[in-house]
Amino acid sequence: MKYHILAFGAGFLMDQIFGDPYFLPHPIRGIGWLIAKIEKVLRSGNPQENSPEREAAERRQGKLLVVIVLLLTGMFTALILVGAYALYPKIGMVVEAVMTYQILAARCLQVESGKVWKQLKAGNLEAAREAVSMIVGRDTQNLTEEGVAKAAIETVAENTSDGVIAPMLYTALGGPVLGFLYKAVNTMDSMVGYKNDRYLHFGRAAAKLDDVVNFLPARISALLMIGAAFLSGKSYNGRQAWRIWHRDSRKHASPNSAQTESVCAGALGIQLAGDASYFGKVVKKPYIGDPKRQVEYEDIRRANRLMNRTAWICELLCLGILMVVAV
């Protein structure tokens, strides 16, 4: 337990300081490569399109994808971790710290959304659209300056749970093996969990599992973010964060996505969400938050500060609980 606590804290600090070095291969990209390869193999020889047999086959294949990816991810990460600790406990601790570092994405989220902020600040709307297209799934080519800023803020808010708090909680609970299993589920959902013609049936299992594993972490993330809003000074409104979360946290097709998004909207006093275009089709969405003022590019940095303070609160709470359990 002592080594797990030290590795957990060190991994968090490494993410805060270094983020993701783009020149190095990242295990999450490896999981993405694995998902793509398995999908290609499973889909070969499918029945004719738009037939009941094809729909049933795709659902079976989607379930098999989930099982194979989770088995391989769990076995591979467990082998690395157990092997490192078998060599020498301190080597195991270092390996666990590096694995924890690779699971978390707070710094990466700040850097990528910061690129959007930088281009908007410079008045370069086209470059800002290009930058935000790297971190959102919607069509960005026709977004206004406010639309670009909103898209970046929504990504920061939603990924406070998906990319920071949820993986942190799972890693604290079960070490990097459980952390990477969570990331595998999350990556499958981001790759095949779309409700379009290609993935409606094939990605159903991954999308449903992602909803399940994020249900509690999303709500814990929202509560932690409300706490961060109360502790973050006059730029944030903790009471409004609580009110908007209570009112708007279910205004999303996903049971989890609006949890932290509603808190962020309330804390900043802005309105998020609304209709968006995906693959050329407009998707109707309810608004989240109240339009007390216009969204501006500086709100991207405010959202990032709120995300980072939420991450620190979660890290300190997890470390405290782990230390109490270890006594």
Segments predicted by a language model, with ranges:
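Substrate/ligand-engaging "lid" and interaction regions
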Residues: 186
